[in-house]
Amino acid sequence: LSVYKKTKSWKTFRQNCIAVCIIILLLAILIFINHYQSDTSFENVKEPSITIIITQDFGKSIFLSKEVTIEGGESAMDVLNEVADITCIYGGGFVESINGVKSQYAGGEGERKDWFYYINGMLASVGATQYKLHSGDIEHWDFHDWRLDRMVTAIIGDYPEPFLHGYNGRVAETSIVYADEFYEAATGLQQSLEKQGVSISMKRFEELSEYEKRSHNLILIDTYENELIAELNANADQLGWFIEFDGKYIITLDETGEKDTSFDHGGVILATQNPWNPKGNWHCENVVWVVTGVTHEDVVTASEILITSNEEIKNCTSIILAKRTIYKVP
């Protein structure tokens, strides 16, 4: 009887030891997994950053393109001052020079050149000391002539902005508005933007509501004969455009307002802050992009640039695509 009890106690002791070992092993595994996941999560967390670009003559010359880490609360001026030598006037709120390139004013109707800055492709509506940067923003400074008073309120060269990050952390809804014959081009563009993280819808011109027209980011796809595109073209000077269609030719202007080149056909990509916004087209709320041309083929070709070759429009204000050549305008 005593032997039986001893044997039973030994078995119980051994089972308890095994159970404790299993528990210890499981705890060790859990600790290891938790530590590994923590390390992995830390490695995958990207520090907040913005991209700053400095160009001249509507993006034709590139001085700087750099990704800069931000901690939060930095202004556009703070980051500019971090990457470049600058001088300011009017109490420090207006940039007079960047790396020695200084504002110029010839007087009268002569040359007037200054630094302008864009956030995600939209001409900023506040001074650089006032705009607080958000992670993902593109801060783009360009030095150009503005004697024409054609204020360029939006550019295409920071694509896919502003559809991805908007302005001041707010992104308007985006709609591709297309004519029936450009359904495939619109679908391809929608899929391309969605892959880049943009939330976007599609609709035919007849389906566009007045509210959407005023409040959305719009990408209009059709020929110059389209009613909305024709309305914008008729106000090209007020929208800051240097590309106009006179009913027969696409005409480009240089920065002085002189006729530069004319084309009997070609694809065109233009941008402006939304002129149908009741507040006006310089409130940095939404934009209108126009993907157009004289012929069906012109429009399709322009669409394909955005879908497959958008690196080619980097830093551009607007473009014409003719005879497989991209002309940056102005």
Stretch-by-stretch model annotation:
Residues 7-24, 32-34:
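N-terminal Sec-pathway targeting helices
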Residues 38, 135-330:
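Solvent-exposed alpha-helical segments and adjacent loops
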Residues 77-131:
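Hydrophobic, secondary-structure "cap" segments at the distal end of domains
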